[in-house]
Amino acid sequence: MKYMENNNTSHSKHPFIIGVTGGTASGKTTVCDEIMKRLENKRIAIICLDSFYRPLSKEDRETVASYNFDHPDAFDWSLVENALRDLKDGKDIEIPTYCFKSHSRLEETVGLGDVDVILFEGILSFYTQSLREQMDIKIFVDTDSDTRLSRRVMRDIAERGRSLEGVLYQYEKFVKPAFDDYILPTKKHADVIIPRGADNVVAIDLIVQHISSKLSEKESFRKSQGQLNVNGGSNTASSVNHA
């Protein structure tokens, strides 16, 4: 999870939630980073769906090479749905920490609350209706399959110590079928589609303008409600005094 704080702004307990999805290595995280960078005067957190993987059983760990991490069953949907719902309701939450080496959920969690914007990203961020209902805007990062494959190969070899053969096997057996069967169909739920991912600066700028506008509207409404409460309180006090 990434977090950026600015202490010079007032905050709302009901954050603006942005869902970001797309295929593996499509540039989801980079798009989120660019949005975060441009909204520098806000408190922002990036939550990754990867944090909500189910811990593998002993049997699954023994055959981890054939475990499908791109299938919906790999995620704890109840946990992630409750987390997003609580955030939307203005509650503080604890985000789990998933260890990719042991394929287990660690005891330590990451606390989160009182933010202006939540960027929730992952390959299946739009998978359930309950998740989609919590989102104020839904973004699909649309990058061609050749680019995604080349990025995945370079990333997994460099960062995860995998062989080229192993990466290609996993891609053909799990990653590509999961994209076709589960990820691509959620594209229809997107409010905004970003072709070419983070390279599409114009699209990201337009999205940030829209988000800034919506946040300004929320802030204006919050202030007006506060003013109404103050005025209402004054009127009540006045009537009591006259009595």
UniProtKB/Swiss-Prot annotation:
ATP binds at residues 22-29. Transmembrane segments: none annotated. One of its GO terms (molecular function) is ATP binding. InterPro entries: P-loop_NTPase (IPR027417), PRK/URK (IPR006083), Uridine_kinase-like (IPR000764). GO terms for biological process: CTP salvage; pyrimidine-containing compound salvage; UMP salvage. It catalyses: uridine + ATP = UMP + ADP + H(+); cytidine + ATP = CMP + ADP + H(+). GO terms for cellular component: cytoplasm. Its EC number is 2.7.1.48. Pathway: Pyrimidine metabolism; CTP biosynthesis via salvage pathway; CTP from cytidine: step 1/3; Pyrimidine metabolism; UMP biosynthesis via salvage pathway; UMP from uridine: step 1/1. Keywords: ATP-binding, Kinase, Nucleotide-binding, Transferase. SUPFAM superfamilies: P-loop containing nucleoside triphosphate hydrolases (SSF52540). PANTHER family: URIDINE KINASE (PTHR10285). Belongs to the uridine kinase family. Catalyzes the conversion of uridine into uridine monophosphate and cytidine into cytidine monophosphate in the pyrimidine salvage pathway. This is Uridine-cytidine kinase B. It comes from Dictyostelium discoideum.
